[in-house]
């Protein structure tokens, strides 16, 4: 039987791609959106695999957050529904890039072409979120 792909599998795959390009200074506006999306998938893996809703309403909330593209909303769910505290260094890094998924992909009032500064912010958030996620997974697996 073939192994089911998880949010972590997709996050790790894009992490390698993102970091290769970052390390080789291949910067493009899509890197900002990809950085946010990688962070989303790391956090969504924790929710998908470890959140245990006890009611239909809680199950609906879980499904809704797994479709969200707001890092703040995803972090709030982890704090409120799963009692997982995200270190301020990690949450602050994600707050900086929250919104890049849309503002760097589509034209509009808040859209912009991401530059090196935003790509560096995205890389920082990705690294911190990855480290946090792998640590949380390890802790949850030990329970």
Question: Each PLM stretch: what is its role?
Answer:
Residues 1-143:
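Terminal alpha-helical segments
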């Amino acid at each position: 039987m073939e192994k089911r792909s998880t949010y972590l599998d997709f996050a790790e795959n894009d992490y390698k791609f993102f970091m290769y390009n970052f390390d080789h200074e291949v910067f493009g506006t899509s890197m900002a959106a990809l950085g946010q999306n990688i962070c989303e998938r790391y956090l969504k893996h924790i929710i998908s695999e470890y959140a245990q809703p006890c009611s239909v309403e809680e199950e609906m909330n879980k499904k809704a957050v797994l479709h969200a593209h707001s890092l703040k909303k995803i972090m709030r769910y982890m704090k409120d529904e799963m009692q997982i505290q995200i270190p301020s260094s990690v949450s602050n890094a994600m707050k900086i890039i929250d919104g890049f998924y849309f503002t760097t992909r589509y034209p509009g009032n808040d859209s912009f072409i991401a530059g090196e500064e935003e790509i560096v912010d995205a890389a920082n958030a990705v690294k911190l979120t990855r480290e946090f996620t792998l640590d949380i997974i390890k802790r949850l697996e030990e329970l």
